[in-house]
Regions:
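A charged, aromatic-enriched C-terminal amphipathic alpha-helix characteristic of glycosyltransferases
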Residues: 340-372
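Nucleotide-activated donor-binding/catalytic signature segment of Leloir-type glycosyltransferases, i.e.
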Residues: 250-270
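Conserved acidic donor-binding segment of nucleotide-sugar-dependent glycosyltransferases
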Residues: 322-329, 336-339
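Aromatic "clamp/platform" in nucleotide-sugar-dependent glycosyltransferases that forms part
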Residues: 287
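Short hydrophobic beta-strand element within catalytic cores of glycosyltransferases
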Residues: 304-307
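Acidic anion/phosphate-binding donor-loop and adjacent secondary structure
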Residues: 177-178, 183, 192-209, 254, ...
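Conserved donor-binding/catalytic core segment of Leloir-type glycosyltransferases
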Residues: 166, 205-224, 230-233
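Short alpha-helical donor nucleotide-sugar binding micro-motif in glycosyltransferases
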Residues: 274-279, 358
């Protein structure tokens, strides 16, 4: 989001960024709309009602007031779930003012009655109408089931012709075309990374002659495949290979065998680059995903990738790794013994290409190209 904003500013196109959670604003073109208390209250409301996206009245009024001052030609939405915005109020403002909208889907939440992903429970109710949700206890967690109400409210609220949907992979675009968004324009713009940052380095991170099997996640939930790393570790030749997991918190660490090296989440990008560059292979056993940039980061550091055939994860691999079926962690053993890949990174997946594609889309949608 900020990468696109910065490039628009460099091209002398008026651009403003509004977000709900995270750091504070740095200038007059940035606006943080929520605080910890309002997010907590919205989250608590969701827990007891299963109506995420239908609170945050005050915060959303502030956004609308800000938007009225900006008078945008295009509004580019990203994740509008996360306990910080009222989707009904937002889209009423958009429709009343007939504002062009680009909306990047980062998961499946916009067209389901509750969940962000549904692969692990193999649920396709979202194609017709959600009800009796099997994932009420997953984000956004609730103790009641209002999935049918949510589904129909979203279907009504998001019904807008002046909306272009962007997905970061072909997999998600195909799902969108089967949802109640099927009549909207859908574009695929792949996520990209900064190749000036993520590149191979000789600074080896690990002092071992063993070959490193690396896993990286910001949060090691069940859908990220942590259990499969533990299963793989049990059948691994420990004289030859070493599993290393990055992003492990203290609570999760207690359930991981000592034979696996764990590293807490790092905000030092240079350290992460050294870790990627030191790995023999990057293993991504994800069970639910959109288009994981960890694959891109690993390949940019010349590390081949093994991933499950999940979501858009295989779309970036090309000849730089292997795609195996979900749960087939045993196949990793066979691949380790025969892998001989010289990674050639595809520049389709660069930050520069991603930004260029978004700006071209803006200009196509809005020929004036004044305020975005």
């Amino acid at each position: 989001m900020m990468n696109i904003h910065n490039e628009l500013t460099n091209e002398n196109i008026d651009s403003y960024v509004i977000w709900g959670r995270g750091r504070k604003e740095k200038n007059n073109y940035e606006y943080k709309m929520s605080n910890k208390l309002s997010v907590y209250i919205h989250g608590l409301y969701t827990r007891f009602t299963d109506k995420t996206g239908f609170l945050s009245y005050i915060d959303t009024k502030k956004i609308i007031k800000k938007l009225n001052k900006i008078n945008p030609d295009i509004i580019h939405l990203h994740n509008i779930h996360g306990y910080y915005i009222n989707i009904k109020m937002l889209f009423k403002y958009i429709k009343d003012n007939n504002i062009k909208v680009v909306w990047t889907f980062h998961d499946c939440w916009p067209f389901t009655g509750h969940c962000a992903y549904f692969d692990m429970v193999n649920c396709n109710k979202w194609m017709k109408e959600c009800y009796n949700c099997p994932q009420i206890n997953t984000y956004p967690k609730s103790i009641v089931d209002n999935s049918k109400w949510n589904y129909n409210m979203k279907k009504e609220i998001f019904n807008y012709d002046n909306l272009t949907i962007v997905t970061p992979c072909k997999w998600l675009s195909e799902l969108v075309k089967k949802s109640f968004f099927k009549n909207n324009d859908v574009e695929v713009i792949y996520n990209g990374i900064d190749k000036n940052i993520f590149k191979y380095t000789n600074n080896k991170y690990f002092k071992t002659n063993k070959k490193i099997i690396l896993g990286v996640a910001s949060e090691w939930t069940e859908r990220k495949g942590l259990k499969d790393f533990i299963k793989l570790d049990k059948i691994l030749n420990h004289n030859k290979y070493q599993i290393v997991l990055v992003g492990i918190d203290e609570k999760t660490k207690k359930n991981i065998p000592n034979s696996i090296i764990t590293i807490s989440r790092t905000n030092n990008v240079n350290e992460l680059v050294n870790i990627y560059s030191s790995a023999f292979v990057f293993f991504n056993p994800t069970y639910e995903d959109n288009f994981p940039t960890t694959n891109l980061e690993a390949m940019a550091c010349n590390t081949p990738v093994i991933t499950y055939n999940t979501g858009g994860s295989p779309e970036s691999i090309e000849n730089n790794g292997f795609v195996i079926e979900k749960g087939n962690y045993e196949e990793v053993i066979n691949i380790l013994e025969k892998i001989n890949i010289k990674v050639k990174y595809n520049n389709v997946f660069t930050k520069e290409n991603m930004i260029k594609n978004y700006i071209e889309l803006y200009k196509k949608i809005n020929k004036k190209g004044e305020k975005i």
